């Protein structure tokens, strides 16, 4: 796998947007007012799996990635990070330590990050490269809102992360 040189920048852009999505509401974006929904939080693996399944059934997702199959969501030991396992059809591992409502990874942006890995995973591409970022923007656009996708794209662009145009198109 090629060097994942934009990983930190991608995480920083997501973290910056996450604080906006935590509460949702109106955001001033270069003189325009954007309405941004509050981010979804999940209670358990069943609700995360149902959300992932619904995202993979979205028409724009199926049109762009018609050959992508389902992905299994499982609990990850520990609490430090979520991750995607590409073998055996794909597995998303989410840590659920802590009380419901306080589980940092049981949230929409973390889950969509891992779904983006599932959609574009390739040993020939960096894990957080342009194809991944384009897929993540598309997921934000169709699963959260076009405003959230615009804010993510601006954050990635500001961080110098290259994007693949075909992946980002609506």
Residue ranges and their predicted role:
Residues 1-109, 118-170:
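Active-site-proximal or metal-binding-adjacent scaffold patches in catalytic folds
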Residues 114:
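Walker B catalytic acidic pair
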